[in-house]
């Protein structure tokens, strides 16, 4: 009797392969060559790193958004004897995300640039591993509609939303009342300024804002954590992912970042997901779901941790969190405007053009000025994003620090 045919490897497209989430995804893939293979790897402009990844993982496709960088990569791979086909431009991101031969898509491109390929993967019915916040913040209704209509499988990668997903009943059909879900509790570390005097926040430097106490992250998301806008965006995401109203989503400051989030049920039970702060855990969970695989993560030692602390968020210290709740309640284009204004304000702060405490001021002023924008299709969403950025830039100029 012949041996059974081994199962086909799952083909994984990694959008944003050279970023933090992309590299962690490839780390997990490399640990399980018997289960997964890289189908397509994409990047914005990082030729050298993508070249190295192509030699290591031999994907069928490599995509660089920058055409000159793509030409450079194509020549280098050809000289190295690689069979990887190099594609260029934003349209190529959409093509590989929706490619019929790909099984799963890690959507890890940061910012509005990641929206179109993530939406394409959802419309193509893929298993979508969603790490791109903007897909839901900018286009929550549109994105979830695409998931439902295509039968795509949506698995959240943010550690908080992945924790909520794990604490919900398997097969949860976005019906909290039927499942007895009372509240979703999103944990937040509180960032580096949880205990710093409010008066001194105006003097915060970019390096201080990027020094997160628990997680290793990029500079933009580190600033978002310092302002707690990151948690505000996650509140909006949770609303769309789990169909929970804003008043049933509570943020809990938990400095140790051991409990990644919780779900409270009607019978009084609270289910929590715990683990060391390592993004490979939610990535491995989503790749193998409903099975469990090794992620290379150090086991959690509760005795080493000793105790867990919880606090209410301080909305005076963190006005960005309040702005996010307000945008979610307002609906329409408010969340898209919030996100665009935040990206522009954070970029200006990192360039030392505005102070740290100016970030929420710029966002609030942009929300006030950029109203009545449409978000009923992807073109309208991107237009609202662009118009909000124009307004935010004018608000930045009005507050810009003189050299």
Swiss-Prot record:
Annotated positions binding NADPH: 18-21, 46, 132, 134, 218
Pathway given in the UniProt record: Isoprenoid biosynthesis; isopentenyl diphosphate biosynthesis via DXP pathway; isopentenyl diphosphate from 1-deoxy-D-xylulose 5-phosphate: step 1/6
InterPro entries listed in its UniProt record: DXP_reductoisomerase, DXP_reductoisomerase_C, DXP_reductoisomerase_N, DXPR_C, DXPR_C_sf, NAD(P)-bd_dom_sf
Family recorded in the similarity comment: Belongs to the DXR family.
EC number(s) recorded for this UniProt protein: 1.1.1.267
Annotated catalysed reactions: 2-C-methyl-D-erythritol 4-phosphate + NADP(+) = 1-deoxy-D-xylulose 5-phosphate + NADPH + H(+)
Binding positions (1-deoxy-D-xylulose 5-phosphate): 133, 159-160, 189, 212, 225, 230-231, 234
Keyword Lipid metabolism: no
Protein name: 1-deoxy-D-xylulose 5-phosphate reductoisomerase
Function: Catalyzes the NADPH-dependent rearrangement and reduction of 1-deoxy-D-xylulose-5-phosphate (DXP) to 2-C-methyl-D-erythritol 4-phosphate (MEP).
Residue numbers binding Mn(2+): 158, 160, 234
Native source organism of the sequence: Aromatoleum aromaticum (strain DSM 19018 / LMG 30748 / EbN1) (Azoarcus sp. (strain EbN1))
Co-factor requirement: Mg(2+); Mn(2+)
Gene Ontology molecular function: 1-deoxy-D-xylulose-5-phosphate reductoisomerase activity; manganese ion binding; NADPH binding
